[in-house]
């Protein structure tokens, strides 16, 4: 599994959709999630522009955090949606919410169904806990809390797992064909070996097993190569795989990856 440790997330893999493409559709940057029509138009145009046979949703890694109360600044001509002021003083303040009930998520779900009905294979990018927390609280504070009161962070991770699992169920019902799990802010280079291992064992592995069961035959699960590297370093990668021993590892934003017939790695 050494190939995963060599994977780097380049700037071109970070950008979900270009401001120029949004502008060409006559949509204001701050309105990318304002309507189902806007979402479907952007996703379809981005798919066609990249030569993909799938539509990629959402267009940022902030949707789940916003549903949980994060202050998310809207996209503009220079950048996509991003975190504003921090809203949590402590990870233990994370509220239990229904992600699918938030306005943006609800429109994304309807857009997923509309894109599917329009002949698109829909790939939905599900964000992990560190990416979510990074929108709501300083990561330095998260690690301090994790060190002093690990049970507080553990309880927050349990709540996150429940919320994201319920959202996965709704995504499957909406007709999403692939769920791509990634945690850009939670890779081993940022967390370090101690917290990387804790996150893998406390959240990532049990969560992937849980949503794999939720997906069943309705939806395929993909994991980011950076997440795969974290699982692999602890010897957990195959434990996250289905009983047959295969797991799909793929960067959905990297050209050619989803087109490959060999994206299932043993």
Regions found by a protein language model. Name each.
Residues 54-74, 92-100, 178-197:
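Glycine-rich, proline-tolerant flexible connector loops at the mouths of alpha/beta enzymes
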Residues 60-61, 128, 185-187, 225-229:
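Active-site-proximal loop/turn and secondary-structure-junction residues that shape catalytic pockets
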Residues 47, 115, 164, 171, ...:
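Conserved, mostly hydrophobic/aromatic
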Residues 55-58, 122-125, 176-183, 218-225:
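Short beta-strand segments at enzyme active-site cores
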Residues 70-167:
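Active-site-proximal, glycine-rich beta->alpha crossover segments in alpha/beta enzymes
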Residues 112-117, 172, 208-216:
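Surface-exposed amphipathic alpha-helices with a cationic face
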Residues 1-76, 197-222, 231-266:
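N-terminal basic, low-complexity leaders that serve as flexible interaction/assembly modules and, when applicable
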Residues 123-145, 174-200:
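Active-site-proximal loop/short-helix segments
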């Amino acid at each position: 599994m050494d190939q995963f440790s060599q994977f780097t997330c380049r700037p071109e893999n970070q950008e979900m959709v270009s401001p120029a493409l949004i502008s060409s559709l006559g949509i204001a940057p701050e309105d990318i999630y304002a309507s189902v029509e806007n979402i479907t138009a952007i996703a379809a145009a981005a798919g066609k522009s990249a030569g993909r046979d799938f539509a990629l949703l959402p267009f940022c890694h902030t949707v789940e955090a916003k549903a949980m109360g994060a202050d998310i600044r809207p996209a503009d001509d220079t950048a996509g949606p991003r975190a504003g002021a921090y809203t949590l003083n402590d990870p233990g303040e994370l509220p239990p919410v229904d992600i699918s009930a938030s306005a943006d998520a609800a429109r994304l779900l309807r857009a997923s169904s509309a894109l599917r009905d329009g002949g698109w294979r829909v790939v939905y990018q599900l964000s992990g806990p560190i990416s979510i927390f990074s929108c709501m609280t300083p990561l330095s504070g998260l690690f301090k809390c994790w060190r002093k009161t690990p049970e507080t962070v553990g309880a927050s991770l349990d709540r996150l797992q429940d919320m994201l699992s319920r959202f996965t169920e709704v995504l499957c019902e909406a007709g999403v064909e692939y769920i791509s799990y990634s945690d850009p802010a939670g890779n081993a280079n940022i967390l370090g070996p101690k917290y990387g291992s804790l996150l893998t064992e406390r959240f990532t592995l049990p969560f992937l097993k849980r949503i794999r069961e939720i997906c069943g035959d309705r939806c395929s699960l993909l994991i980011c190569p950076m997440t795969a590297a974290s699982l692999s370093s602890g010897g957990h990668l195959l434990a996250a795989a289905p009983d047959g021993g295969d797991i799909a590892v793929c960067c959905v934003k990297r050209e050619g990856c989803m087109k490959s017939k060999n994206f299932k790695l043993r």
